[in-house]
Amino acid sequence: MRLPAELAAAIEEALGGAAQLRAAAPVGGGCVADTARLVLSDERRFFLKYDLAGAAPAGIFTAEAESLRRLATVSGLRAPAVIDVRDAESGDAVGAGGPRWLLLEWLEPGRAAPHTWPALATSLLALHRSSGSEFGWDRDNFIGTLPQSNERVGDWPSFWRERRLRPQLRAAVDAGRIDGSEQDRFERLFDSLGERLEAGQREGPSLLHGDLWSGNLHVLSGGDPALIDPSSYYGHREVDLAMSQLFGGFDYVFYAAYHEQWPLLPGYESTRRHIYQLYYLLVHVNLFGAGYRGRTLAALGSLGY
């Protein structure tokens, strides 16, 4: 593939101008933007996420870069280093300032090995042991291409209701994908969150990946795990575990190793896992359509609503 000349020149300049872009190859898996593996004339390699069509929301690359930089401060956790980011801020005309991109360290991919799963547990435990004073984040960010509000609050059930579930429910209702009677069922659940999510309040804010599923686990060439595409904030650690279990999950060795080192409080499997997964199911309803509606309502029904 060949990058547009303006984009290639801007990247070469951002990297110091001493080397030229020799090759670019598409990398699969990009839902928000185009992705490519870059090779420079001095053999350095990088991962590029870019948007030429203006399809990605303004600020999305900046938000991801901030999450990756925060993950990079966690000892024992591997994530790609941020090399450069060029983005429009929210409210700016997307594309008005030229190409937008996120340039990252290239992490050579490999295959999972027996040590991958306990190592992933150790990495996630290190992340979750990075605690905050409140639930939320320094700025709003995104889940997929959808806005994610992170205004800080001290009460976890309120955060999950007002910053996560209610905005996605409102969007689904406005789009006609959830009807009024189904909305009432959600509202009855919301009234119970103070009691049902008390464990999150008790354990306090942990630094989260925020979108932890198998597609955002990158196994390195030696089998070590790295985390990519974060949507970070401070929340209840169980949110990451619940999301990881929503679409197949990781190897059971990962969960056993995590639970051995930091057991979950009672009520996770029966209640809190479903409440946390509801957020991601509503996100899928809003991103991909009513095909996820049935599973979303089934999860709500499993909670008694």
Model-identified regions with their sequence ranges:
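A general structural signal marking secondary-structure boundaries and capping sites
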Residues: A18, S75, H128-F135, A172, ...
